[in-house]
Amino acid sequence: MKRALCAGVTAAALLYLPMAQAQIKVGIILSATGPAASLGIPQKNTSTLLPKTIAGQSVDYIVLDDGSDPTNAVKDMRKLITEDNVDLIIGSSVTPNSLAMVDVAAETKVPMISLAASAKIIQPVDDKRHWVFKTPQNDSLMATAIADNMAANGIKTVGMIGFSDAYGQGWHDEFSKAAAAKNIKIVDYEEYSRADTSVTGQVLKLMAANPDAILVAGSGTPAALPETTLKERGYAGKYYQTHGVANNDFLRVCGKPCNGTLLPSGPLLVAAQLPDSNPTKKVGMAYTEAYEKAFGVGTVATFGGHLWDAVILLENAAPTALKTAKPGTPQFRSALRDAIENLHEVPISHGVVNMSPTDHSGLDTRGRVMVEIEDGKWVLVK
């Protein structure tokens, strides 16, 4: 009887032990609908192109749409972890959603690779952000590129309008520092919501400040609204956008008014225009060719590249993690986190990654170029 009882207790206990699984499971949370859809749709498309095998293990990608809503992003993340037992979370597409997910990554000890831009997602690398990485360039890296270009063009004063959320605030914080270093003064700062349909009031205030240039700190198609409104009102200064607009949907919505606009971008956007010596060109062209073969010529967007790059990080980290533990276990997730943090000189479509315990983005100036919109096309500024 005692032996039978012990066997029963042992069997019951096994039900609560983490079970290794035969494949790597990746949960992907994207904003494929809602205000951020122009970012999330190319990422959703990219999810169909990802490798089915990594380091000899089959990979199961489970893709959910958070509708551009932070609450949904958190709910989706918990579902993927508790019900699907994923080893890695990739997402979300935008900063507010990704920031909301950071606590869940820390609580569950599941590594997360964000596809959003703000440095606040990964900085500082404290107990929470210990589990969080991201593939897009930090806004600080891109802000200095804009300030450098402004200074080279003799711009002394700037008006700024940005999203009334963490993306806009992060850009205001970082660009303020970059501008000050170049003796450029921000003479007015306005905010608007991603879902707003009019920014006339903000535009009138910007124009009253009479700046040499305007910087719009938005992402996706909603970033076109301030620029088109400024053009309608006759503002004739220089226009700058952030890397959050680097897709063809923005060009379609903004149209001719956006010709002449300058912005920093990951090198993927103009991969074909890069010199062959550029360390990102080969990866960028491979992604571009795969995407356009599936979805049509001219459809590639930088935002899809961030998902592609996240899986490149997984491909490089998984072999090391598999030496320690099997997928589906806390030990594997921890080993995978450690392996990602120790990646060095890994070329991705948006730069070359060198992670460290204090840097969970790992990108340097090789991860940015300046681009100008000319006749509705992206043109590398040389």
Residue ranges of model-derived segments:
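Extracytosolic ligand-binding ectodomains
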Residues: 4, 8, 22-382
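Repetitive helical segments and hydrophobic/amphipathic motifs
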Residues: 11-12
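N-terminal signal peptide c-region/cleavage motif recognized by signal peptidases
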Residues: 17-19
